[in-house]
């Protein structure tokens, strides 16, 4: 079992996704497209987080979260998608 130093919460919509660092409460908004995904990873790295020490959590929003899921997997980030009805 991994021991993560922080968790990131995402709120994903059609055009944007919002990210919050749980430890500091810092917030940032990114476009929900590949350019935004890349900016999100740079933002994480500026805060000292990478695939080895952060867990990303978000609600499964179907198509809106699908491309981000693929991107995070490709970059070897751990993430949890929660079903909206739970």
Question: What residue ranges belong to the model's regions?
Answer:
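Phosphate- and other anionic-substrate recognition elements at nucleic-acid/protein interfaces
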Residues: 1-86
């Amino acid at each position: 079992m991994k021991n993560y130093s922080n968790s990131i919460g995402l709120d994903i919509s059609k055009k944007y996704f919002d990210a919050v660092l749980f430890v500091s409460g810092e917030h940032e908004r990114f476009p929900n497209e590949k350019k935004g995904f890349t900016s999100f990873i740079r933002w994480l790295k500026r805060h000292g987080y990478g695939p080895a020490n952060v867990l990303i959590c978000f609600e499964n929003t179907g198509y809106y979260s699908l491309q981000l899921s693929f991107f995070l997997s490709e970059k070897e980030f751990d993430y949890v998608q929660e079903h909206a009805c739970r």
